[in-house]
């Protein structure tokens, strides 16, 4: 029997043109849809496929560790976000 574990991630969603873009942090996987719900659903599928592929290739542990996850008590624990902020910088064009 294959052991399964939950791998949590934070989702950011923003509008880009007529699409909504969903980004899974810290895995750095993205997807899009015509609504926030479609983008979220597409992202969940993309993350699932990304993680299954990594597991099949034997690189899941390396990918999760590079993304800041830690393996504790049989589970992968993602980073604890201290802040997610929007900043700007002035640039002369």
Predicted regions and their residues:
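Generic alpha-helical hydrophobic packing signal
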Residues: 21-23, 30, 50
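A short, exposed loop/beta-hairpin motif centered on an aromatic-Gly-Thr core
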Residues: 27-38
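Short aromatic-glycine-(Arg/Gly/Cys) micro-motifs in beta-strand/loop hairpins
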Residues: 7-26
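Short, charged, surface-exposed hinge/linker loops at domain edges
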Residues: 1-8, 37, 41-93
